């Protein structure tokens, strides 16, 4: 993750007050660019290979937590729950599991009077980019957590961002502009670790049962012809309803008034007869 490269660049200035990680003149790694977190969809590098072996062959954990940098301006740390819309191909139990972990993490910071946690619409992070350490875990039904926290060895200032000052669902406990030290970031990270460990220890049986349930559902779905409703098809259905919004659509072929996924697929492609009443 560029650790030695960034460290050497930071330490190049003898004046400790002028040290900075800015304007690094080269990529961290010539094959994968910014850092090895971008390599988990290919596992091309030895670091990501070894981590994937641990995660998906040796351990198969229920939770994976990736600490990263940096947080959005006017906050301290961005984390789960992530912004909408989430990737609809995942099991809903996985998504609500991520939300539950996020609630435990933000609540822990609030209880310890540590403001500045942002989530949902307050963050740019989602579940859609699927090449990183925590997002590839979703395809294994593992609760993947990512936090992006501010801070570096040189003290910094949390800037004034007016839109961040009023509490809302994205940032329920805003932080005021202030001087920020590296120790503060470490303290926050430790609290977040304890929040995850506390949740895992208290809800061990539930987490184990949930990953079993998600795995069984995946196997069952793979053993039959299974369809996923995509936004394109739901948009087509919305257009049909919009065109006939003052009428009702009655499906003639379905005696039980239940539309199966394969039937709905044909219906949205206009291959199924329906009657407007």
Report the location of each language-model feature.
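Structured catalytic-domain cores with a bias toward divalent-metal coordination
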Residues: 1-277
């Amino acid at each position: 993750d560029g650790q030695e490269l960034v460290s050497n660049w930071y330490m190049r200035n003898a004046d400790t007050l002028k040290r900075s990680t800015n304007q690094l003149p080269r990529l961290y790694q010539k094959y994968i660019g910014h850092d090895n977190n971008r390599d988990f969809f290919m596992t091309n590098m030895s670091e990501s290979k070894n981590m994937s072996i641990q995660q998906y062959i040796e351990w198969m954990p229920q939770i994976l937590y990736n600490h990263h940098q940096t947080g959005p301006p006017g906050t301290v740390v961005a984390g789960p729950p992530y912004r909408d819309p989430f990737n609809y191909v995942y099991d809903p139990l996985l998504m609500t599991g991520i939300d539950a972990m996020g609630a435990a993490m933000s609540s822990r910071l609030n209880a310890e009077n540590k403001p500045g946690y942002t989530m949902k619409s307050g963050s740019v992070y989602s579940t859609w980019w699927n090449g990183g350490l925590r997002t590839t875990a979703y395809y294994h039904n593992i609760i993947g957590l990512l936090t992006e926290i501010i801070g570096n060895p040189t003290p910094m200032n949390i800037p004034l961002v007016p839109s961040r000052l009023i509490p809302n669902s994205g940032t329920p406990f805003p932080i005021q502009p202030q001087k920020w030290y590296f120790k503060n970031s470490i303290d926050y990270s430790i609290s977040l670790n304890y929040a995850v460990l506390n949740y895992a220890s208290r809800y061990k049986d539930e987490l184990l049962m949930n990953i079993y349930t998600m795995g069984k559902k995946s196997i069952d779905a793979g053993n039959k012809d299974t369809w996923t409703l995509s936004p394109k098809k739901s948009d087509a259905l919305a257009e049909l309803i919009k065109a006939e919004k003052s009428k009702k659509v009655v499906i003639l072929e379905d005696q039980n008034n239940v539309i199966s996924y394969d039937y709905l697929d044909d219906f949205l492609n206009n291959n199924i007869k329906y009657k407007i009443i």
